[in-house]
């Protein structure tokens, strides 16, 4: 039988087309399976909110910028959520179940009859008294947030210290009490921000990102690399806040991150206790055995992935990353990570110090310090002795840092002298003409020893980051919380469908599975334990085999533009509103209402209130926006104008009029 060549050709073409369709279909199915294998990777449709339910007058009364929210729809589940371009930062609540109103402040408000007029523990607490927060103060603060802010914010940054200080020998703190109180606080917060009637305990209408404080551990300040009882217990307490795929990594280092806007914006909870000088288990961040070294590697892997996905991130933690608080090697390295990933990191949010202020960090000074350390003629023993002395001082300061403010004015004046005046000098000496820049290029490499090279304004902006330290709920001063506003006006210009760029990336499940293997390969089981590190091993800071120190980041690629903390764009911070509870007025009003015969419950609800203390737009130093350059110019203004500095200090101490005690 003769073969028809045309039929053969036709069948061949049909076969090819069929195989192409099969291949494309398979690719489509695989791609979709890959895309939706994790809840954190999916598309989000963006639309405007056409409802008339926006209460402009209420927003204005809260000091907020009046705006309509944006609606995002999860294309996988169909769930809708509103974005307001705002988030809440709350820290250091320090609730004290032993607080008794009417007792003696000298007895930390736990017992005893007052011996003088000002020695009496007030109903809502006394600013600057040294007592922790009454349970009532915490409850009323959370109740005020529930009634006034919950429906105005997109997420919550919660930076720890959810237990009283260990300042009463009659009632010594126990590990069980610490866990129990943290569980109680966590449940209160879950109740406020969870999606109503949802069967999923992880379904939050407003995502919450907690961090561990130095008083949330037992003994306070001391926290070792996991897995430990404490890391496991905090995962049990916070499991609903932490993405499931990060459980094993959290069990190791008590750090994690949450996509508060999936595929676009994250908040990273960084366990600052592994870099904290006052933690007896922290020697440095140079030894591979050290918790801080290992945590910085984790940070690097996560930031790389966030950068790869085109996302942006806020860093949050309890202890602020300033030289006073961190081991010098930890401070230097952490600051470098903040700088080299400035294309994705928006900023850092911290608590612990109970004062409302900011600290500029100059990466050029950091690099110079690291070079000087390498060139130092100090012997290894001398360096170790110096480190031990610094850590002992830090531990003593941390022990003294209870609720009562001590030498806070002196500290803040030190920030002015060390940081703000340094910024002023840099800005005043900045080279700004093309001729100056050309001369600078020609002189490059001829820098005289001890002489600081001048920079352009743009270089100064680029080489700084800002550490944001928030006021606290505990009445060290007046209780305070802060709402940040950020740019979502460009959100519809970005893409009508968020997450389109996420289609090509692996699920977070696979990423963290891979990361766990990488960390295990880097630090095998025998080496990962902090306790396995001998003193001799800890002293070896330099690698004899010449391998690069992975806890130091690579330089940011030049082609990557600066991120939302440096240039105004989507997610850039634009304004903040500082709220405070004026305890003198509140306690006085409560007493008056009780004297008039009002029931206690009614008097409490009528007397208590948070009000706007100030906003970043307020005189006498209104800020156009909250970029790094805006903070640097504010620092310079504060350094040159004593009148502005006095107002800044009054705000830093939350309108209490605090001054250091004079001898």
From Swiss-Prot:
One of its GO terms (molecular function) is phosphoric diester hydrolase activity. Its EC number is 3.6.1.10. Glycans are attached at residues 487, 526. It catalyses: [phosphate](n+1) + n H2O = (n+1) phosphate + n H(+). It comes from Candida glabrata (strain ATCC 2001 / BCRC 20586 / JCM 3761 / NBRC 0622 / NRRL Y-65 / CBS 138). It is a single-pass type II membrane protein. Catalyzes the hydrolysis of inorganic polyphosphate (polyP) chains of many hundreds of phosphate residues into shorter lengths. Residues 534-564 are annotated as: Disordered. GO terms for biological process: polyphosphate catabolic process. Disulfide bonds: none annotated. Belongs to the endopolyphosphatase PPN1 family. It comes from the Eukaryota. This is Endopolyphosphatase. Residues 36-663 are vacuolar. It is found in: Vacuole membrane. The gene is PPN1. GO terms for cellular component: cytosol; fungal-type vacuole membrane; nucleus.
